[in-house]
Amino acid sequence: MAEEQGRERDSVPKPSVLFLHPDLGVGGAERLVLDAALALQARGCSVKIWTAHYDPGHCFAESRELPVRCAGDWLPRGLGWGGRGAAVCAYVRMVFLALYVLFLADEEFDVVVCDQVSACIPVFRLARRRKKILFYCHFPDLLLTKRDSFLKRLYRAPIDWIEEYTTGMADCILVNSQFTAAVFKETFKSLSHIDPDVLYPSLNVTSFDSVVPEKLDDLVPKGKKFLLLSINRYERKKNLTLALEALVQLRGRLTSQDWERVHLIVAGGYDERVLENVEHYQELKKMVQQSDLGQYVTFLRSFSDKQKISLLHSCTCVLYTPSNEHFGIVPLEAMYMQCPVIAVNSGGPLESIDHSVTGFLCEPDPVHFSEAIEKFIREPSLKATMGLAGRARVKEKFSPEAFTEQLYRYVTKLLV
């Protein structure tokens, strides 16, 4: 009987799912999109990813396992110097991409999964055959920009309205954390009747298990025992300066012998097309020089998956510096690699990190961060204890299996 039910379940046609994403680079949003696509593909769904920009040389390796199509990359990403008008350009690129997919690409699909930019959702209402739409909200976009002038407020007003209105047009809305769910309800007043479900990002543990860590001789100077690691994009909101300031504080807390064995690697996503990446990288280098940290810090830009796994395998702890991070995949990666995390005590890390068990949650100031780092130097066995607890937590709460089943259930429910 059970076998017959299993055969019946397998014989049910699997949905065809199309993912629409603005820029398939190397950020947390891209990591989630890839994991979601791979998860549905593993469940037998037909999956394709359409994006406005895709560079096989600047992407996650798993993207090469999926059919990725690109349209609209010729459209501008900004209006002039300094990345002005980026929001309008992102909306135009995504609307064009949706129109292209719907009317020129000859694609057949049952469900479209989009994220980051909701402006494309109304386009799919134009389809002859009704398409079901799942929108994954990483965080309300209107909260990710400043409005420090009248012109900026005037510019953002229609964009913010479009975001809220079109987000409400989705058939299913998912968010990445309880923190984001609360912010969603607080921000989108007209959508107060909608309770978005939380689908935590998972970790693609297969890629971590299959990689053999390589030696870090070319990245870490000889004689360094305490390797600190920061993984984040070169963006000011990621507060990478906190890691450098904590290092300065740490220098005053350690003996000269221990200090000489400390090294920080600042590894982050870096795209030369993004002005902020270029500027902030130079700002951080200048700060290192001014703080006399040159021989204690290595900057790594756009590193490979193998390098990242090797760094996580070898480091003493990870410094996760952004405040109010929407979720944050880096703490999961670190914990799975049995590496404790020191993170700011706000946002997603409050849900992923178990304080004093898998890492430390601290106030976003260099003194508290340096105190937490010092604990690992004074008590080396702490890394192993917290590392084991961290891996167990990831397996229990953020497994790929749980993510796959939950996502597949949301997709199939749309077609009932």
Swiss-Prot record:
State the superkingdom. Answer: Eukaryota
Q: Name one GO cellular component term.
A: endomembrane system
Gene3D superfamilies (alphabetical)? Glycogen Phosphorylase B
Which pathway, metabolic or otherwise, does it act in?
Protein modification; protein glycosylation
**What protein name does the entry list?**
Alpha-1,3/1,6-mannosyltransferase ALG2
Q: Provide a Gene Ontology MF annotation, just one.
A: alpha-1,3-mannosyltransferase activity
User: Biological process GO annotation list?
Assistant: dolichol-linked oligosaccharide biosynthetic process; protein glycosylation; protein N-linked glycosylation
The record's EC number reads: 2.4.1.132, 2.4.1.257
Function statement: Mannosyltransferase that operates in the biosynthetic pathway of dolichol-linked oligosaccharides, the glycan precursors employed in protein asparagine (N)-glycosylation. The assembly of dolichol-linked oligosaccharides begins on the cytosolic side of the endoplasmic reticulum membrane and finishes in its lumen. The sequential addition of sugars to dolichol pyrophosphate produces dolichol-linked oligosaccharides containing fourteen sugars, including two GlcNAcs, nine mannoses and three glucoses.
- Which residues make up the intramembrane stretches? 85-105
What's this protein's family per the entry?
A: Belongs to the glycosyltransferase group 1 family. Glycosyltransferase 4 subfamily.
The membrane topology of this protein is:
Single-pass membrane protein
Which disease relates to this protein according to its record?
Congenital disorder of glycosylation 1I: A form of congenital disorder of glycosylation, a multisystem disorder caused by a defect in glycoprotein biosynthesis and characterized by under-glycosylated serum glycoproteins. Congenital disorders of glycosylation result in a wide variety of clinical features, such as defects in the nervous system development, psychomotor retardation, dysmorphic features, hypotonia, coagulation disorders, and immunodeficiency.
Cytoplasmic topological intervals: 1-84, 106-416
Q: Does the keyword Endoplasmic reticulum apply?
A: yes
Q: Tell me the keywords, alphabetical order.
A: Congenital disorder of glycosylation, Congenital myasthenic syndrome, Disease variant, Endoplasmic reticulum, Glycosyltransferase, Membrane, Transferase, Transmembrane, Transmembrane helix
Which reaction(s) does its UniProt entry say it catalyses? a beta-D-Man-(1->4)-beta-D-GlcNAc-(1->4)-alpha-D-GlcNAc-diphospho-di-trans,poly-cis-dolichol + GDP-alpha-D-mannose = an alpha-D-Man-(1->3)-beta-D-Man-(1->4)-beta-D-GlcNAc-(1->4)-alpha-D-GlcNAc-diphospho-di-trans,poly-cis-dolichol + GDP + H(+); an alpha-D-Man-(1->3)-beta-D-Man-(1->4)-beta-D-GlcNAc-(1->4)-alpha-D-GlcNAc-diphospho-di-trans,poly-cis-dolichol + GDP-alpha-D-mannose = an alpha-D-Man-(1->3)-[alpha-D-Man-(1->6)]-beta-D-Man-(1->4)-beta-D-GlcNAc-(1->4)-alpha-D-GlcNAc-diphospho-di-trans,poly-cis-dolichol + GDP + H(+); a beta-D-Man-(1->4)-beta-D-GlcNAc-(1->4)-alpha-D-GlcNAc-diphospho-di-trans,poly-cis-dolichol + GDP-alpha-D-mannose = an alpha-D-Man-(1->6)-beta-D-Man-(1->4)-beta-D-GlcNAc-(1->4)-alpha-D-GlcNAc-diphospho-di-trans,poly-cis-dolichol + GDP + H(+); an alpha-D-Man-(1->6)-beta-D-Man-(1->4)-beta-D-GlcNAc-(1->4)-alpha-D-GlcNAc-diphospho-di-trans,poly-cis-dolichol + GDP-alpha-D-mannose = an alpha-D-Man-(1->3)-[alpha-D-Man-(1->6)]-beta-D-Man-(1->4)-beta-D-GlcNAc-(1->4)-alpha-D-GlcNAc-diphospho-di-trans,poly-cis-dolichol + GDP + H(+)
Compartments, record wording: Endoplasmic reticulum membrane
